[in-house]
A protein has these predicted regions:
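N-terminal Rossmann NAD(P)H-binding glycine-rich loop of SDR-like oxidoreductase domains
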Residues: 15, 23
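The beta1-alpha1 cofactor-binding region of Rossmann-like NAD(H)/NADP(H)-dependent oxidoreductases
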Residues: 50-61, 93
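Conserved NAD(P)H cofactor-binding loop of Rossmann-fold oxidoreductase domains
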Residues: 79-84
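Substrate-binding pocket helix/loop in short-chain dehydrogenase/reductase
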Residues: 87-88, 95-97
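Active-site helix of classical SDR
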Residues: 111, 147-150
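Residue(s) in the substrate-gating loop at a strand-loop-helix junction
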Residues: 131
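SDR active-site lid
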Residues: 164-233
């Protein structure tokens, strides 16, 4: 019962990048943090549970383990994810499925596991990490953009399902962030000649933007502050720059929006 008066929080993908920084920020704010990832990279004051979010049984087992010890789960932050880049024509179906299995269905697995307990306790907060790429449809990053768009649509609908039970669902749209995500991305420039060099140019632009992106520690603190809110919004966009970009993508005529994206990444 150590966590009776502290928030009990799960962070997926907590071994690196945004997940790790978020877990650290939550710990520093006084939360009891459980980190789900396949790799155990110890962090003081944070409990690691070896969980592959694509393994539904492993997720369910880990959540039950937390409930047995803490009796509640206050919040979940779904950070686990990775990216693939390359032309759709040259991306295998297995690669595309792997992208969705982690980014989308991994999030679904974790949320399904915690929802019965949150519904029973009459409160909870699910935070799903999306991306500005969900609304700015980036060529040669098609499956990543699609997986994040799926997260956003799913989150809006889920909010309507669970709001009557005191459960909040929040989407956090992120832009370019300087983490190991760039190095971890599965990159392919297959077909670059057929596409007139556009694949390599687009991938290079993405990598440049990420290497000059926001500090992940700032993002971790930003997400930790959302967890503290009593009445969180359904959508937050990190930084004024990306808030403006996200808004533009949502209000501009589709033809204008796509022309801008094509000019930058096409």
């Amino acid at each position: 019962m150590a966590g009776k008066y502290k928030k009990i929080v799960i962070v997926t993908g907590g071994s690196s990048g945004i997940g790790r920084c978020t877990a650290s920020a939550l710990r520093d704010s006084g939360c009891i943090v459980y980190e789900f990832s396949r790799r155990n990279i110890p962090m003081e004051g944070i409990t690691h549970l070896s969980v592959d979010v694509t393994d539904e049984n492993a997720v369910n087992s880990a959540v039950k383990q937390i409930i047995q010890k803490e009796t509640k789960i206050d919040a979940v932050i779904n950070c686990a994810g990775f990216g693939i880049s390359g032309a759709v024509e040259f991306t295998s179906t297995d690669q595309a499925k792997a992208q969705f299995n982690v980014n989308f269905f991994g999030t679904v697995n974790v949320n399904k596991a915690v929802l019965p307990f949150m519904r029973h306790q009459g409160n909870g907060h699910i935070i799903n990490i999306s991306s500005v790429a969900a609304v700015a449809h980036i060529p040669f990053q098609t499956f990543y953009s699609a997986s994040k768009a799926a997260i956003s649509s799913y989150s809006y609908a889920l909010e309507n399902e669970v709001k009557p039970y005191g459960i909040h669902v929040t989407i956090v749209e992120l832009g370019d962030i300087y983490t190991g995500f760039t190095q971890m991305r599965q990159k392919s420039i297959l077909g670059d000649d057929e596409y007139g060099g556009r694949i390599s140019r687009s991938v290079s632009q993405m990598e440049h933007d990420e290497q000059n992106g926001m500090n992940p520690e700032v993002i971790g603190k930003y997400i930790a502050n959302i967890v503290k809110k009593k009445k969180p919004a359904i959508v937050y966009v990190a930084s004024a720059k990306y808030k403006f970009l996200s808004l533009l993508c949502k209000i501009l005529p589709a033809a204008v929006r796509e022309k801008i994206v094509e000019k930058v990444y096409g």
